[in-house]
Regions:
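Bacterial N-terminal signal peptides
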Residues: 8-15
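Sec/Tat signal peptide C-region and signal peptidase I cleavage site
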Residues: 16-21
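Extracellular beta-strand elements of beta-rich domains used
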Residues: 28, 272-279
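Carbohydrate-binding surfaces in secreted/extracellular proteins
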Residues: 28, 115, 177-239
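Extracellular glycan-recognition surfaces and repeat-rich motifs
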Residues: 36-84
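Secretory/extracellular carbohydrate-interaction modules
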Residues: 76-157
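Short, aromatic/His-centered strand-loop micro-motif at the edge of beta-sheets
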Residues: 160-184
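Flexible glycan-contacting loops in extracellular carbohydrate-active proteins
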Residues: 215-275
Length: 288
């Protein structure tokens, strides 16, 4: 009996560090990609290469569909398939579109992530992004989520980051995103605390178009080149960059939290290649 218990705890100690650093990934390579509604069958609930999730995909509002198109960017890994998120149709407007999935493990310290998107239309009253929130958050929007990474915010052509309603950081310069173009959104959370603890944390977000993303992918150090880049539209620049320090914060990325693809005021926006990593920015963007 003692031998069995010792064996169990030995295996647990081996697996635990890997679990804490487990990568979260979704490339939307579902078994059925023929413009099929997300989560409508067993073949449309999880990607075949997805990992790090504690649930299948759930639809809360709007109409998400799975498409065979892949948001490929030169220099980065990618699998076939993507999620087309369609906002809820209202009499005189287009409401929210939300597809969400629960992550398995939590992260402490520095955490890196990314996602790709391509929007069919971008109007002043539209917004999109990736939201990280507690389960059951109601209402769920850009300022109620625990963390928000939004390359296009409502009321502006630029993006924003947020850690709740009182900690919103808005971009006012750089290059605005344009319709029918693919973008890579890269984010980093620095110094995340353990559950129940407080410490200063830092939020970072970069928005890159295809040429910019491929340029940084070609560099010897993706992270160093990205951090040194200036704002602008040239390949060696970044379209948008935001940074915000929040002191004495209890906010973190804990096991069981929910990652949501979010849009409002948008008829169609395509999401793809969602990644969260403990390793590095290079790992979080899927450098090939």
């Amino acid at each position: 009996m003692k031998t069995q218990i010792l064996f169990f705890f030995t295996i647990l100690l081996i697996l635990l560090p890997k679990a804490v650093c487990a990568e979260v990934y979704e490339g939307f390579d579902m078994a059925d990609l023929n413009s099929t509604p997300l989560a409508s069958s067993d073949a449309t609930r999880v990607g075949m290469t997805s990992s790090g999730w504690n649930s299948t995909w759930q639809v809360t509002i709007g109409k998400p569909f799975l498409e065979p198109i892949d948001l490929e960017i030169k220099g980065f890994d990618s699998v076939g398939g993507s999620l087309e998120l369609r906002g809820e149709r209202k009499p005189n407007s287009i409401g929210q579109g939300v597809a969400m999935r629960q992550i398995t493990e939590g992260f402490i310290g520095d955490v890196y992530g990314s996602f790709r998107f391509n929007a069919k239309a971008l109007k002043i009253e539209s917004a999109l992004g990736l939201l990280l929130s507690l389960p059951g958050q109601n209402p769920l929007n850009l300022t109620t989520a625990t963390f928000t990474f939004c390359p296009k915010r409502w009321g502006s052509e630029y993006g924003m980051m947020a850690a709740g309603k009182e900690r919103v950081t808005k971009s006012e310069t750089g290059e605005a995103c344009v319709p029918n173009a693919s973008y890579l959104v890269v984010w980093q959370l620095e110094n995340l605390p353990k559950l129940g603890k407080r410490q200063s944390i830092i939020l970072n977000m970069w928005v890159l178009d295809e040429k910019q993303a491929s340029y940084f992918a070609s560099k010897n150090s993706f992270e160093s080149a990205l951090r040194l880049a200036e704002l602008g539209s040239e390949p060696e620049q970044v379209g948008q960059y935001l940074r915000r320090e929040i002191k004495n914060s209890k906010r973190g990325l804990f096991g069981g939290m929910v990652a949501s693809c979010f849009s409002v005021g948008m008829p169609k926006v395509t999401f793809d290649e969602i990644r969260i990593s403990k390793e590095s920015l290079a790992d979080a963007v899927g450098l090939s």
